């Protein structure tokens, strides 16, 4: 049954210089996009779930490893355990929003979206023959369900480590909050907050709890519905007790001494229109998707009220998550900054096709040399995680690491994700709240 509305292009009246017409889609497209493992399991020659990939056999698995992970295993930095492919379904609310609204979505000439309400903007299978496939795919990622409508991450530990020695150089303990003002599908109000005079799409707020010298340092980011409008970002400096606006160039600086830039948050935390985007094709890759309580867990945090423990670390410098990897259908999205002075040459984002979340990111410098690796481990929300997340239909952020290959340094990120709107209301994401919380 056709779900997409047939749009007739009359060449003399509607030129390509206006908008790219919406493509019709079918229920089969929906199934393939959101339920790829219902009747199919990805395979690869020489691979069996349960295999351990190490320095001795890595060449056998090269085709199903991202380029950085292949390098690390080949160099003896880590070996990885594998497990069978499992289903990570998103909430039916998000799928239904796609059915209701995707047929009206089009691309404007500047690459922005037109008529987007909620759900997955382009549920059709991307094609390398489509010159706009990369632009469509990045919007599916940008408006994906990575944090649901509202997410709190607390506790959230960032540990700076020397890759060579494993020495812990510093540890920051955060609390983070994420809120979608529009395109909402789960929490009321849906699909948007009625009062949003700033036309904000998303708010991000973080506060440092420890160590003492950085306590109460806070960051606030407003991303706007108009993607051509630059984000606003503010930093409350705890020891100075004042708010300062971040300049545009500071989003590519190291954030609080870590291996992440603000632009790196969640894989890519910037405007779609700041990059040129290309679809690099589909491939089956080993990705860190798992059930949290089935992994080897650390003994931290201690005395958590829910009895929660972080994923543990292993490998060279203790820079790798101690988790299992599973073979999943993945889309390669290649982003190249339009600014010739940008420190990054390109981002290679490996998107999990079912959840449209970033499973790994490999960045290259302007010379074309591999620079950083940034995987995000995903835990199942219904199995082996917190009761508050059950039924939320989100592939939960569960562990991440940024390895700066050139600097020989890494930042591991261990966290407790909660999909809830108990705390996350618009008044939390204001400059006034920065001052209030910093007192």
Question: Which residues make up each language-model segment?
Answer:
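Bacterial N-terminal signal peptides that target proteins for export
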Residues: 1-8
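Bacterial N-terminal signal peptides
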Residues: 8-17
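Solvent-exposed N-terminal domain segments of exported/luminal and surface proteins
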Residues: 23-231, 237
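Extended beta-strand-rich segments in extracellular/periplasmic secretory proteins, especially
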Residues: 164, 172-197, 204-210, 265-349, ...
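Coil-to-beta-strand transition motifs
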Residues: 199-201, 212-214, 226-229, 240-242, ...
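Acidic, serine/threonine- and glycine-rich low-complexity intrinsically disordered segments
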Residues: 218-293
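C-terminal soluble interaction/assembly domains
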Residues: 336-421
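Long, C-terminal catalytic modules of enzymes
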Residues: 418-439
């Amino acid at each position: 049954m056709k779900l997409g509305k047939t749009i007739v292009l009359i060449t003399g009246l509607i030129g390509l210089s206006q908008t790219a017409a919406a493509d019709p889609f079918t229920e089969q497209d929906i199934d393939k996009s959101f339920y790829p493992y219902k009747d199919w399991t990805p395979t690869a020659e020489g691979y069996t779930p349960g295999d351990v990939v190490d320095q001795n056999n890595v060449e056998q698995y090269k085709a199903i490893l991202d380029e950085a992970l292949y390098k690390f295993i080949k160099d003896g930095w880590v070996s990885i355990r594998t497990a069978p492919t499992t289903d990570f379904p998103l909430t039916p609310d998000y799928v239904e929003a796609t059915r209701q609204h995707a047929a009206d979505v089009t691309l404007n000439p500047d690459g922005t979206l037109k008529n987007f309400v909620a759900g997955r903007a382009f549920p059709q299978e991307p094609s390398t023959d489509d010159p706009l496939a990369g632009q469509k795919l990045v919007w599916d990622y940008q408006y994906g369900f990575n944090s649901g409508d509202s997410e709190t991450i607390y506790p959230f530990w960032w540990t700076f480590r020397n890759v060579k020695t494993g020495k812990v150089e510093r540890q920051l303990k955060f609390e983070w909050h994420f809120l979608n003002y529009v395109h909402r599908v789960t929490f009321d109000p849906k699909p948007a907050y009625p009062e949003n005079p700033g036309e904000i799409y998303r708010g991000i707020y973080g506060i440092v709890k420890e160590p003492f010298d950085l306590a109460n340092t806070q960051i606030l980011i407003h991303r706007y519905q108009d993607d051509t409008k630059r984000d606003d970002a503010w930093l409350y400096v705890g020891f100075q007790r004042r708010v300062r606006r971040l300049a545009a160039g500071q989003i590519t600086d190291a954030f609080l001494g870590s291996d992440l830039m603000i632009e790196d948050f969640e894989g890519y935390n910037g405007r779609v229109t700041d990059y040129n985007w290309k679809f690099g094709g589909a491939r089956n890759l080993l990705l860190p998707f798992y059930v949290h309580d089935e992994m080897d867990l650390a003994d931290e945090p201690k005395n958590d009220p829910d009895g929660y423990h972080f994923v543990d670390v292993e490998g060279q410098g203790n820079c790798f998550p101690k988790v299992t990897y599973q073979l999943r259908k993945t889309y390669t999205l290649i982003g190249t900054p339009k600014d010739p002075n940008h420190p990054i040459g390109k981002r290679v984002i490996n998107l999990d096709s079912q959840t449209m979340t970033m499973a790994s990111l490999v960045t290259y410098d302007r010379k074309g040399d591999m620079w950083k690796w940034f995987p995000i481990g995903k835990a199942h929300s219904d199995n082996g995680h917190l009761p508050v997340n059950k039924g939320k239909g989100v592939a939960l952020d569960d562990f991440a690491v940024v390895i700066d290959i050139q600097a020989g340094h890494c930042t591991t990120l261990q966290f407790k994700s909660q999909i809830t709107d108990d705390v996350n209301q618009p008044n939390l994401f204001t400059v006034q709240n920065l001052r209030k919380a910093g007192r």
